[in-house]
Amino acid sequence: MKIKNKSMVYWSCRRGMLELDIIINNFFKKEFDFLSNKEKIFFVNMLSYDDIYLYKCLIFNYEPKNKKIKKIIKLIKRSSFSFS
């Protein structure tokens, strides 16, 4: 899968939970352009997961079984929850 339309990816970042909207949109705005092509694909795939699952992963430290999604979750958490 190739990332052809960045604005469509951005639109897909919109979630039904405010907390996820803030975390995922901020990550997209700050970090998406710096991801490798593989990481971009992992990120887009992660967006297909439902909100409750992503919320558990990002807020309650649930570990995804999928290693690719786990990597993106780790990047999002590092970006979102760093206080530097």
From Swiss-Prot:
Q: Which UniProt keywords apply?
A: Chaperone, Cytoplasm
Which InterPro entries does the protein's record reference? SDH, SDH_sf, SdhE_FAD_assembly_factor
Q: What are the record's GO terms for cellular component?
A: cytoplasm
The protein's matches in SUPFAM superfamilies, at most eight in alphabetical order, are given as:
YgfY-like (SSF109910)
- Give the source's domain of life in one word: Bacteria
**Could you mention a single GO BP entry for this protein?**
succinate metabolic process
Q: What does this protein do?
A: An FAD assembly protein, which accelerates covalent attachment of the cofactor into other proteins. Plays an essential role in the assembly of succinate dehydrogenase (SDH, respiratory complex II), an enzyme complex that is a component of both the tricarboxylic acid cycle and the electron transport chain, and which couples the oxidation of succinate to fumarate with the reduction of ubiquinone (coenzyme Q) to ubiquinol. Required for flavinylation (covalent attachment of FAD) of the flavoprotein subunit SdhA of SDH and other flavinylated proteins as well.
Q: Which PANTHER family match?
A: FAD ASSEMBLY FACTOR SDHE
Q: What is this protein called?
A: FAD assembly factor SdhE
Encoding gene, per UniProt annotation: sdhE
